[in-house]
């Protein structure tokens, strides 16, 4: 690897999770000579009570909109211009809603040196004319850099509060994975590096669909046994989907890492996909209304991912092999009754 230190880090994104990660990286680079001591964080500029969000972050060292109550290290610098933020960066941490990745990559393509490395923390997938496209593939194609992925049972506020958790880095180049582990690991944020990067990334996207189904169950008052069935059948569909759509071999062991079963459980019991989906059942409001009310306007990944997965399954003529994924899509977008989530469990092919 031809990167010479100290390595400059740029975080592309500054929402709830991006800010929590900035807190970790800002602290870590102060103590590691391998990394430059200042970290750029690209912030989509917003006005908060008449003040620019970047100005608030750079003076008060807190993202008052997306991670209120947690101080960011003073060496994390909020930069409103994307090209300025990534200038001379050696390591790029992508942590934005997945629907913006094309636009962001187009904007910075050619502005990052060719030895730079990326890691995506983005939980989502995309669809192309050939079917499934992973976010890491899009970054790799548009920017011509090597890209690792990080996924795990990581609710952002708990990470920011330094409560113990694990996470998984997937990297086809072990050396690159270990470099990002060095940048990100703390005593309370423990990292395992695996080479099955595509499965790690798929887990991070697909578990949000299952969490929506879990939220529907909570809204219907179904109880813990039903939710356990949602989690198990959801995991079976995740594994089946990976076996069909991953280009390389899929290791079942990857599903036992933090990115797999652990992230699935935490998202189905905590996490915003579950919470908003429960409110969707109880309030009768649309997902869009609830995003505005409950998430400060941030986007929910589960419903969008279910729509992308549904279109990919349609292309392959495999919709009825994934009844849980399909039910979530149809309830969110086609006005099907929420009770369909239960009937899809009752007649699931796993039981036939």
Curated annotation (Swiss-Prot):
<dbReference type="GO" id="GO:0046168">
    <property type="term" value="P:glycerol-3-phosphate catabolic process"/>
</dbReference>
<comment type="similarity">
    <text>Belongs to the NAD-dependent glycerol-3-phosphate dehydrogenase family.</text>
</comment>
<feature type="binding site">
    <location>
        <position position="156"/>
    </location>
    <ligand>
        <name>NAD(+)</name>
    </ligand>
</feature>
<dbReference type="GO" id="GO:0141152">
    <property type="term" value="F:glycerol-3-phosphate dehydrogenase (NAD+) activity"/>
</dbReference>
<dbReference type="GO" id="GO:0042803">
    <property type="term" value="F:protein homodimerization activity"/>
</dbReference>
<keyword id="KW-0963">Cytoplasm</keyword>
<feature type="binding site">
    <location>
        <position position="123"/>
    </location>
    <ligand>
        <name>substrate</name>
    </ligand>
</feature>
<protein>
    <recommendedName>
        <fullName>Glycerol-3-phosphate dehydrogenase 1-like protein</fullName>
        <ecNumber>1.1.1.8</ecNumber>
    </recommendedName>
</protein>
<keyword id="KW-0520">NAD</keyword>
<dbReference type="InterPro" id="IPR011128">
    <property type="entry name" value="G3P_DH_NAD-dep_N"/>
</dbReference>
<dbReference type="GO" id="GO:0051287">
    <property type="term" value="F:NAD binding"/>
</dbReference>
<dbReference type="Pfam" id="PF07479">
    <property type="entry name" value="NAD_Gly3P_dh_C"/>
</dbReference>
<keyword id="KW-0560">Oxidoreductase</keyword>
<dbReference type="InterPro" id="IPR008927">
    <property type="entry name" value="6-PGluconate_DH-like_C_sf"/>
</dbReference>
<dbReference type="InterPro" id="IPR013328">
    <property type="entry name" value="6PGD_dom2"/>
</dbReference>
<feature type="binding site">
    <location>
        <position position="272"/>
    </location>
    <ligand>
        <name>NAD(+)</name>
    </ligand>
</feature>
<comment type="function">
    <text>Plays a role in regulating cardiac sodium current.</text>
</comment>
<feature type="binding site">
    <location>
        <begin position="272"/>
        <end position="273"/>
    </location>
    <ligand>
        <name>substrate</name>
    </ligand>
</feature>
<feature type="binding site">
    <location>
        <begin position="13"/>
        <end position="18"/>
    </location>
    <ligand>
        <name>NAD(+)</name>
    </ligand>
</feature>
<dbReference type="Pfam" id="PF01210">
    <property type="entry name" value="NAD_Gly3P_dh_N"/>
</dbReference>
<dbReference type="GO" id="GO:0005975">
    <property type="term" value="P:carbohydrate metabolic process"/>
</dbReference>
<feature type="binding site">
    <location>
        <position position="301"/>
    </location>
    <ligand>
        <name>NAD(+)</name>
    </ligand>
</feature>
<dbReference type="GO" id="GO:0005737">
    <property type="term" value="C:cytoplasm"/>
</dbReference>
<feature type="binding site">
    <location>
        <position position="299"/>
    </location>
    <ligand>
        <name>NAD(+)</name>
    </ligand>
</feature>
<feature type="active site" description="Proton acceptor">
    <location>
        <position position="207"/>
    </location>
</feature>
<dbReference type="InterPro" id="IPR006168">
    <property type="entry name" value="G3P_DH_NAD-dep"/>
</dbReference>
<dbReference type="InterPro" id="IPR036291">
    <property type="entry name" value="NAD(P)-bd_dom_sf"/>
</dbReference>
<dbReference type="InterPro" id="IPR006109">
    <property type="entry name" value="G3P_DH_NAD-dep_C"/>
</dbReference>
<dbReference type="InterPro" id="IPR017751">
    <property type="entry name" value="G3P_DH_NAD-dep_euk"/>
</dbReference>
